[in-house]
A protein has these predicted regions:
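An edge-strand/N-cap motif at the start of beta-rich repeat modules
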Residues: 1-38
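A short beta-strand motif characteristic of beta-propeller blades
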Residues: 2-9, 38-44, 80-90, 123-129, ...
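Short beta-strand elements that form the blades of beta-propeller/WD-repeat-like
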Residues: 19-24, 60-65, 103-108, 144-150, ...
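Structural motif
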Residues: 28-30, 69-74, 112-115, 154-163, ...
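Short loop/turn segments that connect beta-strands within beta-propeller blades
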Residues: 34-37, 76-79, 118-122, 166-170, ...
C-alpha cells in the first residue's frame, strides 16, 4: 500500500525519535509527527542544495547542512537555532559518518582528512592529515572513533582502520589500528534500523565476490557480509532491518522488501517518479523518497 505524505521533491529521510520523521527537501529540512497524521512540527532555515542532517539523541541537537558544507545547528524539540550559519569545510557528508561529543563534531573534509567542528565559536580544525592515505568515513561507537582510511592514489591498497578514544576535553587519543586487505574501498555508511549496527557499502575482491553491504563489528575487528550490492539494490538507496532479516532493495525505479536469508521478495513498490532513497519506519512500515514526494508504505 502506497500513501503520499509529502508532495514536494524529497531526497532523504530518517526517524530522529520514535514518532518523528525528518525529511530532506531541496532547500530545507522538515520534521513530521507520525503520530498526528504527519503534521509538520519543524522547518529549518533555508540552504541551497540541502544535503542531509545529523541528530544526536542524547543532546537532542540537530545539525542540518547542504552539499557545499554550510550548516545550521538547532536544539530540539523546541527547534531553536543555536548558531549563525556554520561552514563545515566538507561536502556531501553522510549523517552516519559524523561523530559528536560535547561541543565537537568530527567528519571527513573535502581534502579527505579528519576535521573537527567546535560549536562554541564555529571554528574548524583539520587533524589526521596524511600524504599517503585519506579519511573516507568516521564511525562512532560510544566514546570511540573508528576512522576508515584508504590509499590516496588509485593503486593496490587496503582499508586501514584507526581507533581513537575521545577524552573529556574532546581530544583524540590513539588506541590501535588494523588493516582490511580484501576491501579496496568503503564509501557508504548507514545505520541499521536498530541504530546500533553499522552497515557499510564495500567494494570487495578477495573474501567475497562482488560488492556487498557488510555489517561492521568493531569489537571483533571484522565485517560480516549481509547482502550483495547489485543493479537492483543500489549502494546509496537501501536500508536494513537485521533483527527482522529484511532489507529495502531500492533503485531509481522500484523498492523491494526482501527476506535476507532466503532472498525472497516480500513486497514490491513502484511509486510515481524517480526514487532517491528508502527507509524503515517501523517493523511493518517504511518511507520512499522521490522527486514527486514522500510515500509511506505498509508491508
Amino acid at each position: 500500500m502506497l500513501k503520499k505524505i509529502i508532495k514536494k521533491r524529497a531526497y532523504e529521510g530518517n526517524k530522529i525519535e520514535d514518532n518523528l520523521l525528518f525529511v530532506t527537501l531541496q532547500t530545507q529540512i522538515v520534521g513530521l509527527d507520525m503520530n498526528n497524521g504527519y503534521e509538520q512540527i519543524f522547518l529549518s532555515d533555508k540552504l541551497s542544495n540541502m544535503c542531509n542532517f545529523y541528530y544526536d539523541k542524547d543532546t537532542k541537537q540537530l545539525l542540518v547542512y547542504n552539499t557545499s558544507g554550510h550548516a545550521y545547528l538547532y536544539q530540539m524539540p523546541e527547534g531553536k537555532r543555536l548558531s549563525q550559519k556554520l561552514y563545515l569545510r566538507a561536502m556531501d557528508l553522510q549523517p552516519d559518518s559524523i561523530a559528536h561529543k560535547g561541543d565537537y563534531y568530527w567528519y571527513s573534509d573535502t581534502n579527505f582528512c579528519l576535521r573537527r567542528l567546535d560549536i562554541k565559536d564555529g571554528s574548524t580544525k583539520q587533524i589526521l592529515k596524511d600524504k599517503e592515505r585519506r579519511v573516507v568515513n568516521v564511525i562512532q561507537v560510544a566514546d570511540r572513533l573508528y576512522i576508515f582510511t584508504d590509499m590516496r592514489r588509485e593503486i593496490e591498497g587496503y582499508v586501514k582502520i584507526l581507533c581513537y578514544h575521545i577524552d573529556e576535553n574532546g581530544d583524540l587519543k590513539y588506541e590501535f589500528e588494523w588493516g582490511e586487505r580484501p576491501y579496496v574501498f568503503m564509501g557508504y555508511v548507514r545505520r541499521d534500523f536498530d541504530r546500533k549496527t553499522v552497515i557499510v557499502g564495500a567494494k570487495t575482491y578477495t573474501k567475497y565476490v562482488g560488492d556487498y553491504y557488510v555489517a561492521f563489528e568493531p569489537e571483533n575487528k571484522r565485517f560480516v557480509p549481509i547482502y550483495p550490492i547489485t543493479d537492483e539494490a543500489w549502494e546509496l538507496y537501501g536500508h536494513t532491518m537485521l533483527e527482522e532479516n529484511k532489507i529495502f532493495a531500492a533503485n531509481p525505479k522500484y523498492v523491494k522488501v526482501i527476506d535476507i536469508p532466503s532472498r525472497k521478495v516480500l513486497a514490491k513498490y513502484e511509486p510515481e517518479g524517480t526514487i532517491y532513497s528508502a527507509t524503515f519506519l517501523t517493523k511493518n512500515k517504511g518511507a520512499i523518497f522521490t522527486d514527486k514526494g514522500v510515500y509511506e508504505i505498509t508491508f
